[in-house]
Structures are given as C-alpha cells and as structure tokens.
Regions:
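Helix-loop-helix junctions and helix-breaking kinks within/between transmembrane helices
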Residues: 24-35, 73, 78-89, 165-170, ...
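Transmembrane alpha-helical segments and their membrane-water interfaces
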Residues: 42-51, 70-129, 184, 222, ...
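N-terminal signal-anchor transmembrane segment
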Residues: 1-50, 66-77, 336-340, 352-359
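A membrane-periplasm/extracellular boundary helix in multi-pass inner-membrane enzymes
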Residues: 71, 128-133, 206, 223-258, ...
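Alpha-helical transmembrane segments of multi-pass inner-membrane proteins
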Residues: 114-141, 163-206, 213-224
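Hydrophobic transmembrane alpha-helices and their immediate junctions
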Residues: 51, 188-193, 216, 220, ...
C-alpha cells in the first residue's frame, strides 16, 4: 500500500506542478501532455489492481457527461482535430487530478500547490524575457510593420511566446495561478504575499489587457461576495464603476481590438438567425468559428455557443457552476477571472484551470471531513 501511495503521490506531483507546462511554439508535444499520460496510467493501473477500494469523485460525473456529449456529437461536425483534443484533454485533466487528489491530505496538496506556483513563476519569467527580447515587428502574412502603425507597437511584443500563439493565453495562465494562490492566501493555507506580487508583475509583462484588467475587477467582485450587501456598498460599487468607465472608456473607444468584440457579437447573432436547428443545438464543430462568421470568436461563451451549440454551452457552464456549492463558493476564485477575461479571449487548452479547480474541490472536501493532516489511507 505504501508503494501504491508513493506512486500516486509522484503522479499527483507531476499532474499538478506541470498542469500549465505548454511549449507549443518550441516542442511538437508539450510536457503537459506527458504529465497527463503519467496521471492516466496511474489511475488506470491503481483501478486494475485495487478495484475494490477505488473511489470516483461525484464531481467527475458532470464532466464525464460533458465528455460523452462531445464525443457523440463532434465527430459529425468535422471539428479541427487539435482543438477538439485540447477541449477533451482539459476536461479529462480535471478528472485525473481530482481522482488522484482524493487519496491525499491537505498538507500534501498545499505543498504541491506551492511547487506549482513557483514553477509557474519561473516559467512565466522565462517566457516574458524571451518574448520581450524577441519582438515580431512584421505582421504575419503581410508586409505591414507594427512600428509603422500608431498605437500598435506593443503587439510586436506579444507574438513571440514560447508557450502559446500569443501572450494573451499566457495571461490566462498567469491569472489562474494568481487567483489560485489568492484563494490559498485568503483561506490561510499560505502566508507570503510575494508570489502574488511576482505573478501580478508577470501578468503585466504579458501585455494582455484583458488579463491585466481582470485582476482588479475580480478582486473587487470577490470582496463584495464576502459582504452582507448594504446600500453604501452598492453606492461605492456604482461610484467605482463610473470612475472606471470615465478613465478607461476614452482610452479604448477607438481601439480596434475593443470594437471588434461588439462586431463578433453582431456576427454571432446573425449566425444564430440563419443556422440550422442542428447547428443551433449541437454547434458547428470546435475550431470552426472562423469558417462560419469570418472571424475568430475571441469570446469564451461565443466560442462554446457556436462550436458546441446551446447544449454544449449549457454543459460548459454546468461543469463550472456545479462546483460552487461543493467548494463553498471557493471555485469562484478561478471561475470569475476566467469568465471575465473570457469576454475577450477564448482558449481551448486550459488544463491548468481545471487542475486548480480540482484541487480547490478536494481541499475543501478534506476540510469538511477534517482530513487536513492525515490521509484516510
């Protein structure tokens, strides 16, 4: 049993710490896929040799139903294969992490969480240094130069990421790490503020405006969720929102990227009006948004609506909202920032998000069952 437990802890270490280890611009196969394979082998192997004692988390059920829906509908929609794999991969990542974590106590989970945070800091620091020192001035597929267009120069420092297509996706990873540590700090599992400061600086270096803006917005929302709302809280909230609009709106009113978000919503509405009932309910296939509206969705909800249909969008929302009650609302530490930043960005490969969600679920479960120091095995 000790040998089995040690093997499981090794698998847990790899799946947690490297859950965001994407190097898509450097390697044909990112390390995160290898860690997923390790976790999968351990779960299957343990299930085979310890079938009588295997325990599957109830939280996995809705994820499994979502996966079944995807597997039974997407093959008929001719999806982009890599995009489909990333969606399934991220959902399966949650199932792997949660079902390995169930056999660990919070002492182990918090320790591995710290390793994850510090590994993320090192990885994002390396990514930032490389990207900023290797700007891409010429717009891909054209002869246009970012240096020749007013207000566009900063884009040159976003497209040479070693991790993803551009630094906006790096910003999402940074957001998840930031607010996962913020959750640990608020629940007094960790003490230091240093990782939060470093992660915020690294988010700034991504130059992702959606990620940067999401940080204060999420902290503001999380703060109000802890209060018994009174009239003066509402007045303060309204005042802050008005102040933000006064300061921010003039800066982005003529911004092409900002205006394109409204164009995407308009194109989505037109698509829904002319699409078939089949496409309305089941979607057009993951990765096919551009083929149908002429532009990438750049919106988490629009992406799932168009590509997996109304049913798929409901499943996506369900797997996220189903954890709120079981985690005593702590899953909102991650879901809120993902949804806010998702209004202008849609990433299919978010294994790090689901890994941290799984950890929050198990940590809160252990607290309820008073499994904080000793594992029940």
């Amino acid at each position: 049993m000790n040998f089995t437990l040690n093997i499981r802890n090794v698998a847990l270490f790899f799946t947690i710490v490297f859950s965001g280890f994407y190097l898509t611009r450097v390697l044909s196969l990112s390390p995160v896929y290898i860690t997923f394979l390790i976790g999968s082998i351990v779960i299957v192997g343990y299930g085979i040799f310890n079938f009588s004692s295997i325990h599957i988390s109830k939280a996995s059920v809705i994820f499994l139903l979502y996966i079944v829906y995807i597997l039974t509908t997407q093959p008929f929609l001719n999806p982009d294969f890599n995009t489909l794999i990333n969606v399934l991969f991220s959902l399966f990542y949650f199932i792997i992490v949660i079902n390995i974590s169930l056999y660990s106590n919070n002492k182990i989970l918090i320790r591995y969480s710290k390793y994850f945070i510090w590994f993320t800091i090192v990885l994002l620091a390396i990514e930032s240094i490389w990207r900023i020192t290797h700007p891409v001035f010429v717009i891909e597929g054209t002869n246009k130069d970012y240096r020749d267009t007013e207000g566009m120069l900063f884009y040159a420092y976003k497209f040479s990421s070693i991790m993803f297509k551009d630094s906006n996706f790096v910003g999402t990873y940074g957001l998840v790490a930031f607010f996962y540590y913020y959750y640990l700090k608020k629940n007094r599992y960790v003490k230091s503020n240093i990782p939060l400061i470093i992660l915020f600086l690294l988010i700034l270096l991504t130059l992702s405006r959606s990620a940067i803006i999401t940080v204060p917005f999420t902290i503001f929302i999380l703060y109000f969720l802890t209060l018994k709302i009174r009239l003066y809280h509402i007045l303060i909230g309204v005042f802050i929102l008005i102040l933000i609009f006064i300061i921010v709106l003039p800066q982005i009113a003529n911004d092409g990227s900002f205006l394109s978000k409204f164009n995407i919503l308009e194109l989505t509405w037109l698509h829904l009006q002319k699409c078939s009932l089949f496409e309305f309910f089941l979607g057009v296939g993951f990765g096919n948004t551009f083929k149908h509206i002429g532009i990438g969705a750049h919106n988490l909800f629009v992406t799932h609506l168009i590509e997996s249909g109304v049913i798929g969008l409901l499943f996506f929302l369900s797997v996220n909202f189903s954890l709120i009650k079981h985690t005593r609302k702590n899953s909102l530490f991650l879901t809120i920032p993902l949804f806010i930043s998702g209004m202008s960005l849609a990433g299919h490969a978010i294994s790090f998000y689901y890994a941290c969600l799984a950890l929050i679920y198990v940590i809160q479960r252990n607290e309820r069952k008073n499994i904080s120091i000793n594992s029940h095995l």
